[in-house]
Amino acid sequence: MIGDSLNPLADAVRRSKVEWIGVRHEEGAALAAAGQAKLTGQLAVCAGTTGPGSNHLVAGLYEACRDHAPVLALSGDMPRKFHGTDYIQTTEPDLLFRDVSLYTETIASAAQAGPVIHQAMAAAYAGPGVAHLTLPQDVLATKAEGSVASIATLRPRPEFAANEHDVAELARRIDAVDRIVIMCGAGCRGAIEELQKLSDRLKAPLVHSFRGKELMAYDDPRWMGGLGIIGTRPVYEAVRDCELLLMVGTDYLIPTSCPTKER
């Protein structure tokens, strides 16, 4: 959302091919960026101006933080000559954004901009999660020179295969029980066929986390529904009574919704 401290950025965007989407509130901008990042897996960017403008971003950015969506948040700031003077709308953005972000930094010079922006984007992808940059107005108005690092290497996290010991241990645990439930999250995107085959092989129903609810058609016979606040009683009982809960593509953990008996 535009504001005085972001005017140099808005002018640069106006002269580029970058699309600027206006919103009515900074929290809405952060939520929209989080939604885009979750749907595409690609970095999304939002911005807020000095003081209350950037403060409002924080609430929406927790959506990206908790759901591990790659988002770059930009905070406009007063010119550097006013730092430390109790100037109007003075805040400490780096402190404010520390809890919600994986990376937060202030760009103090035009020469620093390229490397720091690249590092922030890399951090957002590596999490994935939120990276934050504070942009003083006078720095934004300064022409940056020199080469800019390529973004060709910036990608969502690579895939990793489990080591042989972990695979063998998982197989041992599966063989030792009869009642298995598979809980699916957003990390299962792109592997639905494999998930269905696993369900058939183990004769295990599929339940989903909040972000996994769109993975499969609701009339799929393997699909029981959701667990947790949006869950159903049959799902809760299936998870409560299972001997092994396989969590695939999710870090979901609400103790009141998970098995309580020691197995």
Model-flagged regions — what are they?
Residues M1-R263:
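N-terminal alpha/beta PP-like core and its mobile active-site loop of ThDP/TPP-dependent enzymes
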